[in-house]
């Protein structure tokens, strides 16, 4: 490698952005084909390619940052800005769903019966499974903070335990949400109530699955001694993302489940 007189990371050419883009194309086209023609082949191919891309891209970043030392303080600063901007874009993504919900619920049209929830819709009880889900996610926010403090204090065993607990709580949330969807008395096809409910809570659920995966990668890295008390941005990014998912759920719970019912 040629000598460089600066602290910035000159990235080597990589095939993963291309394979990631192809995976996204296959998954979105596959989704449309699944909806219209009931075939999941293309979507499955896209998912497999996406998982392969994720694995190999993350592997390369771990090699560059942990083993080759390319993640100098200025590079880490850039990664921090990148993660902050990404979470900001996600805030606006969810803002669209809240806008749709409040637009529909604050001035219900005569077609909806002039009331909210619309005529014929039986909303879910906010004090049953949704309240338990809120408690589960808030507890996971506590355990991920515990993991962060453990890493900063060099408490390896505690960090592993608290991270594993956070992932288990995330999986428990996902299982409860799946059960709630299965037993819901309305579907995504039930007018604007069904659409806004399932799209907003469904995308949040997807983000919980992504966050759990992110934390699972951090757990594997922590087990393999990748994180030190000074050098653990991968975990920090995962923790920020998890707190974001937490806050979005609180807004969803208060707006759609509690006020909306």
UniProtKB/Swiss-Prot annotation:
Alphabetically ordered keywords of this record: Membrane, Mitochondrion, Mitochondrion inner membrane, Translocase, Transmembrane, Transmembrane helix
Enzyme class: translocase
GO cellular component, one term: mitochondrial inner membrane
Residues in compartment: Mitochondrial matrix: 1-15, 67-72, 153-155, 224-232
Pfam families, per the entry: COX3
Catalytic reactions of this protein: 4 Fe(II)-[cytochrome c] + O2 + 8 H(+)(in) = 4 Fe(III)-[cytochrome c] + 2 H2O + 4 H(+)(out)
Ranges facing Mitochondrial intermembrane side: 35-40, 106-128, 184-190, 257-261
Subunit structure: Component of the cytochrome c oxidase (complex IV, CIV), a multisubunit enzyme composed of 14 subunits. The complex is composed of a catalytic core of 3 subunits MT-CO1, MT-CO2 and MT-CO3, encoded in the mitochondrial DNA, and 11 supernumerary subunits COX4I, COX5A, COX5B, COX6A, COX6B, COX6C, COX7A, COX7B, COX7C, COX8 and NDUFA4, which are encoded in the nuclear genome.
Name recorded for this polypeptide: Cytochrome c oxidase subunit 3
Organism of this sequence: Cyprinus carpio
Organismal lineage: Eukaryota, Metazoa, Chordata, Craniata, Vertebrata
């Amino acid at each position: 490698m040629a000598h460089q007189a600066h602290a910035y990371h000159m990235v080597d050419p990589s095939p993963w952005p291309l394979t990631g883009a192809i995976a996204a194309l296959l998954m979105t086209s596959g989704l449309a084909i699944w909806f219209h023609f009931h075939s999941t082949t293309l979507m499955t191919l896209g998912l497999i390619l996406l998982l392969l891309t994720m694995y190999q891209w993350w592997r390369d970043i771990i090699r560059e940052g942990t083993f080759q030392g390319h993640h100098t303080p200025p590079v880490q600063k850039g990664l921090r800005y990148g993660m902050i901007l990404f979470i900001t874009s996600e805030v606006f993504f969810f803002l669209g769903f809240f806008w749709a919900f409040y637009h529909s619920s604050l001035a219900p049209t005569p077609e909806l019966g002039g009331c909210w929830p619309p005529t014929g819709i039986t909303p879910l009880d906010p004090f049953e499974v949704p309240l338990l889900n809120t408690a589960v996610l808030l507890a996971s926010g506590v355990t991920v903070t515990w993991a962060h403090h453990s890493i900063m204090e060099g408490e390896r065993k505690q960090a592993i335990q608290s991270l594993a607990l956070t992932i288990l709580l995330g999986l428990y949330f996902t299982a409860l949400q799946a059960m709630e969807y299965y037993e819901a008395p309305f579907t995504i096809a039930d007018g604007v109530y069904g659409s806004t409910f399932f799209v907003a809570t469904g995308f949040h659920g997807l983000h919980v699955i992504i966050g759990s995966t992110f934390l699972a990668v951090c757990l594997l890295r922590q087990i393999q001694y990748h994180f030190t008390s000074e050098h653990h941005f991968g975990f920090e990014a995962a923790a920020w993302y998890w707190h974001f998912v937490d806050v979005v759920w609180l807004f969803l719970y208060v707006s759609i489940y509690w006020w909306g019912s």
